[in-house]
Amino acid sequence: MENKKEQPLVSLLVSIIIPAVILSKFSTEEYLGVIPGFLVALSFPIVYAIYNLIVRKETGFIAILGFVSIFLTGIIGVFEFPTEWLAVKEAAVPLLIGIAVIVSLKTPYPLVKKLLFNEELLDLKLIDKKLRENDNLFEVDKMLVKSTFMIAGSFLLSAILNFFLTKYIVVSPAGTAAFNEELGTLTALSYPVIALPSTAVMFVALYYIFKSITKLTGLPFEEILSDKLKEKSK
């Protein structure tokens, strides 16, 4: 039986949004308290990652990202570290993702190939056949490397924007009510800062991949799509 695929919106809600709201709004002494609030917020991505591991046989990237992000934010708040560390943390998350995207090129499972050049989107057997016929297998590898650096660049941009956004918004000492309110504002703004440029560049990379494949295979766009997408388009 095929495992259910991770739902990105549900993952985002459970692993990032709900924990962030708990940290910023319910970790004060009048509600949960600092330590209990931190532990409750952290429990959401942990439980969701365990659920993914049991049901889908994978931990889920967003759940892991949520855990790391909430854990680091909570540590900064609980131990009242200087707010500069929060700016570093907010920049570090997308920066590390971008580095991971590039490093994955040296592994058997490049992330861009897994995300964009896969059988869910494309008819890989037909594409491979045409690439071999046209002697363009090397060219498609070069195309995937270029698209990898495009996507990694989007995360670098997000890291820079996140750093300055955090420095601008969070100015109160950690452990104060003002810090928690500013953290809530940051949460509301920081993920669009990550998501919007990354999504835009992802679409550009996807367009570049599709355009390159049609050129290298000599097939029209409709022919390179997976059977599943062809059925949906009817």
Cite the ranges covered by each PLM segment.
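C-terminal membrane-adjacent module
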Residues: 120-224
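Structural signal for membrane-spanning alpha-helices in multi-pass inner-membrane proteins
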Residues: 19, 23, 52, 73-77, ...
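Lipid-exposed faces of alpha-helical membrane segments in multi-pass integral membrane proteins
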Residues: 10, 14, 18, 40-47, ...
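Structural signature of hydrophobic alpha-helical transmembrane segments
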Residues: 29-43, 62-63
